[in-house]
Amino acid sequence: QLCGRGFIRAIIFACGGSRWATSPAMSIKCCIYGCTKKDISVLC
């Protein structure tokens, strides 16, 4: 499960820097249910 800082770090790792868009719904989903790298890469 990715919440808070862990979620942001996973996005930065997957997207490579600041090229990502925030998605509150995805953040909540990842925190509650967990996310795969594919789920996170959608935000890039």
Curated annotation (Swiss-Prot):
Domain of life where this protein originates: Eukaryota
InterPro entries named in the record: Insulin-like, Insulin-like_neuro_ligands, Insulin-like_sf, Insulin_CS, Nem_insulin-like_b-type
Cysteines joined through disulfide linkages: 3-31, 15-44, 30-35
MF-aspect GO terms: G protein-coupled receptor binding; hormone activity
N-terminal signal peptide: none
Modified residues (Pyrrolidone carboxylic acid): 1
Gene Ontology cellular component list: extracellular region
Record has Secreted as a keyword: yes
Coiled coil: none
CDD domains hit by this protein: IlGF_relaxin_like
Keywords: Disulfide bond, Hormone, Pyrrolidone carboxylic acid, Secreted
Subcellular location: Secreted
Main localization, broad class: secreted
Family to which the UniProt record says this protein belongs: Belongs to the insulin family.
Complex formation: Heterodimer of a B chain and an A chain linked by two disulfide bonds.
Official protein name in the record: Relaxin
Organism classification: Eukaryota, Metazoa, Chordata, Craniata, Vertebrata
